[in-house]
Amino acid sequence: MTASAWGLLALFLSVLGLLAWPLGRGLAAVCDGRLPGWMHRAEAPLYRLAGVRPEAGMHWRHYALALLAFNALGVFAVYALQRLQGVLPLNPQGLPAVAGDSAFNTAVSFVSNTNWQGYAGESTMGYLVQMLGLSVQNFLSAATGIAVAFALARGFAARGGDGAGHVGNFWADIVRITAWVLVPLSFVLAVFLAGQGVIQNFTAYQDVATVEATVYQDPQSDAQGQPLKDASGNPLTREVRTRTQTLPMGPVASQEAIKMLGTNGGGFFNANSAHPYENPTPLTNLAQMLAIFLVPAALCFAFGRVVGDWRQGVAILAAMTLMFVVAVVAVTAAEQAGNPALSALGADPVASALQAGGNMEGKEVRFGISASALFAAVTTAASCGAVNAMHDSFTPLGGMVPMVLMQLGEVVFGGAGSGLYGMLVFAILAVFIAGLMIGRTPEYLGKKIEVREMKLTSVAILVTPLLVLVGTAVAVLAPAGQAGIANPGAHGFSEVLYALTSAANNNGSAFAGLSANTPFYNVLLALAMWFGRFGVIVPVLAIAGSLAAKKRLPPGPGTMPTHGPLFVALLVFTVLLVGLLNYVPSLALGPVVEHLVLQAR
């Protein structure tokens, strides 16, 4: 890593810590319902209108049912908006209704906080669908994840042991998280982004004349959207020459803010945060990276306050940060080393005062390797999926690092809420392993970890690897899945593995060489996204209910401390061993083989 890369990483982590600590205090207050009187008075009409008693606790089953019903309604709403787009207002380009399979995939994607996009936003979605459908779900899906994290924190903090298993009120949680956390933060960030040059308007697209003609290759596809290939298996293209360019417009800044703060990641434009209208300057790039990690980091501090020991939250955050720093160093080093194939032709990969060096393919020159690699690690450590560079153009090992960060279960900071509850599931497993080693009934934060909790923990951990590996196997075996692979060999397999990894872990980024906007991939990835999201949330809520029903025991002489460096090391080891071991064979077939082949040339 270069000196600038180390400096950027240090600046990023320092500012993140300064911002996350006070936000953690606010999140803890929202979780506990300790809000100023005027906030309660402002909420009251909403609760009366909906017939909700916010002070009434819910059993975990009722909480889960409310959550599932709420998100299922969200899928129907977003799907309907897309299918009716042709007759809706605020569509200055007259974009038609979205195809059924793509609309289904997109609806599930945004409701599940994945924001996988098989479509190009500027040529598919009108302004009303972007605002009323996609942006609204950016708020609500993030609020859902934070609500689940709150429920699990309450399960650990509960002291009564009355057997009721109440974990809070889902409707009150959604209202408070959205109104008092996400909306204010998004407003501030949106104003900042607009001031830096991110566009915010409702005008029609602008056609402008270019200084000189542009010649490019347009990939050809059949009626089903599959890439056409020649006899050698190479994609067919046609040469296009033009002297005009269409500049897309739209209300971007308002959507960009919650896209990052909610760890959603779905771009207004196809190029996502590589587009200058979404992410114009290095300063906005830094702000967007900070926004991605802000809520996940603050939730760690909030968790410590809710359970009554701030050190517990710091230990969780320390484990996340340790793994994140290692990942940043790995991906930056891989990209800075460059492409051996180009080095063999005489290209100089060494960074100097006159060049960035390394592998600049697919990266914006205004960001360079350091900011692009850091952004890639941030967006895949969190379940965000926004990109400011094309991950498909990374070196084999550089592209493997984002994939591994997702395969760990999106617990290295992770998504808004999902990162914390995912890491707490691994913490339960870690104390169980420690209990086996010393022959004691494991405890975590005063709650005994027994058979029921371990069964639910196993389900929560194994859901996503099962979806990823089975889904990848189906895709590479099915003719419809094979047809979408444009790149042959190991990289083509990596593209499929990345897609299923991203979908099942609710990340949303992609190796964009895969033609995924087809009925086969739209349905397959939608199923992976839905069950990857709610197949984990339901067992986590069940764990929360089980813990809430138990008495909280005081620490004894044999209780394992869970706030020191030993526990942090054990937690990191557990995440790496259990979270990553499932994927070693598939990684060996994809990026590892590709790296070895590249080095051998």
Curated annotation (Swiss-Prot):
The terms describing its cellular component in GO are: plasma membrane
Q: Which UniProt keywords apply?
A: Cell inner membrane, Cell membrane, Ion transport, Membrane, Potassium, Potassium transport, Transmembrane, Transmembrane helix, Transport
Membrane topology per the record?
Multi-pass membrane protein
Which cellular compartments is it found in? Cell inner membrane
Q: Which InterPro entries match?
A: KdpA
Family to which the UniProt record says this protein belongs: Belongs to the KdpA family.
**What is the documented function of this protein?**
Part of the high-affinity ATP-driven potassium transport (or Kdp) system, which catalyzes the hydrolysis of ATP coupled with the electrogenic transport of potassium into the cytoplasm. This subunit binds the periplasmic potassium ions and delivers the ions to the membrane domain of KdpB through an intramembrane tunnel.
- Output the HAMAP family linked to this UniProt entry: KdpA
- Return the protein name: Potassium-transporting ATPase potassium-binding subunit
